UniProtKB/Swiss-Prot annotation:
Quaternary structure annotation from Swiss-Prot or TrEMBL: Homodimer. Within each dimer, one monomer is responsible for RNA recognition and catalysis, while the other monomer binds to the replacement base PreQ1.
Protein name: Queuine tRNA-ribosyltransferase
A Pfam family hit: TGT
Residues noted as binding Zn(2+) in the record, renumbered to the chain: C307, C309, C312, H338
GO CC annotations on file: cytosol
Role: Catalyzes the base-exchange of a guanine (G) residue with the queuine precursor 7-aminomethyl-7-deazaguanine (PreQ1) at position 34 (anticodon wobble position) in tRNAs with GU(N) anticodons (tRNA-Asp, -Asn, -His and -Tyr). Catalysis occurs through a double-displacement mechanism. The nucleophile active site attacks the C1' of nucleotide 34 to detach the guanine base from the RNA, forming a covalent enzyme-RNA intermediate. The proton acceptor active site deprotonates the incoming PreQ1, allowing a nucleophilic attack on the C1' of the ribose to form the product.
Amino acid sequence: MMKYELKSTSGMARRGRLTFSRPQGECYVETPAFMPVGTYGTVKGMTPEEVKATGAQILLGNTFHLWLRPGQEIMKMHGDLHDFMQWHGPILTDSGGFQVLSLGKLRKIKEEGVTFQNPISGEKIFLSPEKSMEIQYDLGSDIVMIFDECTPYPATLEYAKKSMEMSLRWAKRSRTRFDELANPRALFGIVQGSTYEELRRESVKGLINIGFDGYAVGGLAVGEPKEEMHRILEFTTPLLPQDKPRYLMGVGKPEDLVEGVRRGIDMFDCVMPTRNARNGHLFVSDGVVKIRNAKYKNDTTPLDAECDCYTCKNYTKAYLYHLDKCGEILGARLNTIHNLRYYQRLMAQIRQAIEQDCFDEFVVEFYAKIGKEVPPLHLKSE
């Protein structure tokens, strides 16, 4: 069970709360929320306790990868994904659609589903909307995503239309199988339509007719210019139900989160804070620190004076530079702790600004600190 409560707004920005019924009682996710990505049932290099300490309340797991390894049977032997990875908060799982897109020539898309070559074993396997619902049921996902085709960019109007229409048919099949399983959790629809406004409108209408607990905006952050992403968000979010959460999939940089919230988005996920951390790319209050730069070799200041994370409270830039130079695992861990905490602090600041109805002022201050211009906002009136 999942409930969404819209608590306050500031412009298009929304402050809300998701409530989940878990075996240990009710769990809350304050929105706008950022979900760290635990592809294989782990946020890389972090224990669940460490992830929780950054302020994260919900994680994302990857249906496709967990299906291939360790598989449904091993998952069921433990109970579900929560028991397997020992994270007892809510988990959202994606449906596998994006991973299938990324396989490129290794996959063949038909009406029934997708046949592809297992990237691990080389064998041919088949994933359908029904199978995706069954895997996510066994994972015990608190938020299940429908199986869709993530339309690649660029796409012709003809291709994008066919792709969106098939995704709608798959959405209906996902809903039917989800209900047949008597899954008590939440099911989210995914809006497709590439960069074509009329297709996005048609997709939203079709999904609302089927009926979902929340709505994701998919098919963005797949190579399109930022201006295009902003334009499609500005067009799409006003069409979505006010009383349901909105999720922007696979996004993104700190400024992308701010821009998503400006356009009415409630939930985000991205590998960026964790992947960038392992590459020495660290997010700080006034921009970015690339810790591999030799200028940090003798720098005895903390990474970010405004940050309260374990890394910033205990270590200097010189130490983090040293760990990275030596290839020490601890360096990647400390970097990850910081980046995840940065993202959660950013979301907390966003929520507070919406509560105080001063989100526009927050946006101006945020961009001033990182030395960038505030992108224009051209919201469509419906």
